From Swiss-Prot:
<feature type="transit peptide" description="Peroxisome">
    <location>
        <begin position="1"/>
        <end position="9"/>
    </location>
</feature>
<dbReference type="GO" id="GO:0006635">
    <property type="term" value="P:fatty acid beta-oxidation"/>
</dbReference>
<keyword id="KW-0443">Lipid metabolism</keyword>
<comment type="subunit">
    <text>Homodimer. Interacts (via PTS2-type peroxisomal targeting signal region) with PEX7; leading to its translocation into peroxisomes.</text>
</comment>
<dbReference type="InterPro" id="IPR050215">
    <property type="entry name" value="Thiolase-like_sf_Thiolase"/>
</dbReference>
<dbReference type="InterPro" id="IPR020613">
    <property type="entry name" value="Thiolase_CS"/>
</dbReference>
<comment type="function">
    <text>Responsible for the thiolytic cleavage of straight chain 3-keto fatty acyl-CoAs (3-oxoacyl-CoAs).</text>
</comment>
<dbReference type="InterPro" id="IPR020616">
    <property type="entry name" value="Thiolase_N"/>
</dbReference>
<feature type="active site" description="Acyl-thioester intermediate">
    <location>
        <position position="115"/>
    </location>
</feature>
<comment type="similarity">
    <text>Belongs to the thiolase-like superfamily. Thiolase family.</text>
</comment>
<dbReference type="GO" id="GO:0005777">
    <property type="term" value="C:peroxisome"/>
</dbReference>
<keyword id="KW-0808">Transferase</keyword>
<protein>
    <recommendedName>
        <fullName>3-ketoacyl-CoA thiolase, peroxisomal</fullName>
        <ecNumber>2.3.1.16</ecNumber>
    </recommendedName>
</protein>
<dbReference type="GO" id="GO:0010124">
    <property type="term" value="P:phenylacetate catabolic process"/>
</dbReference>
<comment type="pathway">
    <text>Lipid metabolism; fatty acid metabolism.</text>
</comment>
<feature type="region of interest" description="PTS2-type peroxisomal targeting signal">
    <location>
        <begin position="1"/>
        <end position="9"/>
    </location>
</feature>
<dbReference type="Pfam" id="PF00108">
    <property type="entry name" value="Thiolase_N"/>
</dbReference>
């Protein structure tokens, strides 16, 4: 009867509330037993520039299975987020699972909810475990912006859509939405540059201290030099992190999207290549298999916001998750908020009343990079590593989503 009550609580639209509820341990909890990512490298310039998204994903999944020691035959589903590939990479990323040694009996699904795709993949697996459809699954995300980023990634709008005032806002360039947020909410250029410089500073310190080594799986690949000669390399470090970046230096950069604007290459996320993957399972199964439990996956929420202000998504997704759980921002120890742009990240932090010292302690996408479909999964690898090292418990991930949405999730470390 207790097990049925626990399961019923988990399946309710609104989960049990309060710190005691989220930190309790029940056999049917969804738990994370492994979370890894690849290094993130510069789009068109970095060591992954000649590596396809399918190759990236295959290498990461193979590494995840090896490091976790999970029997791949036990995996109930693999869900992969991707934004830029046709059909979210449904064909090539299914093939990547097979190359990684995951048997053909394990199904695969590709999904795309823009920059939250990696998180949506993790949440999809969690929901299937809660519903009793599977016991074990992998939620992952991957993006090769070197190979697939560009204007042709969006289908042209018909006259009907172009003449719909709300619908056509979905075509507003992301940089312009950043300018809209900065203008509407008075986020100054000076504040944005200071925030961006801090992201670089934190990321450089984390990299120098070897903190990212715990979350990054080295990937062997080949890269073409300037003479088109192939060279074998092992990629294990983010190459967009630059020590010595200051607000003063960033202040000299020209605006990228508007002559009078405040957004530029130094206070916006980097175009990047990379992947992330999270192994989830039912607590009772994890205990039976002797899998180390890193965290309990508690809740996830997605909200809609105006497309022209898409960056404010976290400002509304984070409170939505916390309200469902009967928590406040003060109950959260670490926030991983995607830095699509400094403007929107700063607004979201301030709108929610979050202590900025709790946000992105290892830096964020401005310094590390933002491979669109991978970020939501990457954040778990970074967050769980940080929670383990710091001894803290409650963590939140969040991001804005192109076309006007925001998503957030909450985990409790063990």
């Amino acid at each position: 009867m207790d097990r049925l009550n626990n399961l019923a609580t988990q399946l309710e639209q609104n989960p049990a509330k309060g710190l005691d509820a989220i930190t309790s341990k029940n056999p049917d909890d969804v738990v994370i037993t492994a979370a890894y990512r690849t290094a993130h490298t510069k789009g068109g310039k970095g060591l992954f520039k000649d590596t396809s998204s399918s190759e990236l994903l295959a290498s990461l999944l193979e590494g995840l299975v090896k490091e976790s020691k999970i029997d791949p035959k036990l995996i109930g589903d693999v869900v992969c987020g991707n934004v830029l590939a046709a059909g979210a990479g449904a064909t090539e990323h299914r093939a990547a699972c097979l190359v990684a040694g995951i048997p053909e009996t394990v199904p695969f699904v590709a999904l795309n909810r823009q920059c939250s795709s990696g998180l949506m993949a993790v949440n999809d697996v969690a929901n299937k475990i809660r519903a009793g459809q599977i016991d074990i699954g992998i939620g992952c995300g991957v993006e090769s912006m070197s190979n697939q980023y560009g204007p042709n990634s969006v289908t042209p709008f018909s006259n009907k859509f172009q003449n719909n005032e709300e619908a056509k806002k979905c075509l507003i360039p992301m940089g312009i939405t950043s300018e809209n947020v900065a203008a509407k909410y008075n986020v100054s250029r000076k504040a944005q540059d200071a925030f961006a410089a801090k992201s670089y500073e934190k990321a450089a310190a984390a990299q120098a201290a070897g903190k990212f080594d715990q979350e990054i799986l080295p990937i062997k690949t080949t890269v073409l030099d300037d003479d088109d000669n192939e060279k074998e390399v092992t990629v294990n470090k983010d190459d967009g992190i630059r020590p010595g970046v200051t607000a003063e230096k960033l202040g000299k950069l020209k605006p990228a999207f508007s002559a009078e604007g405040t957004t530029h290459a130094g206070n916006a996320s980097q175009i990047s290549d990379g992947a992330g993957a999270v192994l989830l399972m039912r607590r009772s199964v994890a205990e039976k298999l002797g899998q180390p439990i890193l965290a309990k996956f508690v809740h996830c929420k997605t909200v809609g916001v105006p497309p022209e202000l898409m960056g404010i998504g976290p400002a509304y997704a984070i409170p939505a998750v916390l309200e469902d759980l009967g928590l406040t921002v003060n109950d959260v120890d670490v926030f991983e908020i995607n830095e699509a742009f400094a403007s929107q990240a700063l607004f979201s932090i301030q709108h929610c009343g979050i202590d900025e010292s709790k946000v992105n302690p290892r830096g964020g996408a401005i310094a590390i990079g933002h491979p669109l479909g991978a970020t939501g999964a990457r954040q778990f690898a970074t967050l769980l590593s940080e929670l383990k090292e710091s001894g803290k418990k409650v963590g939140v991930t969040s991001m804005c989503i192109g076309t006007g949405m925001g998503a957030a999730s909450l985990v409790v470390a063990e």
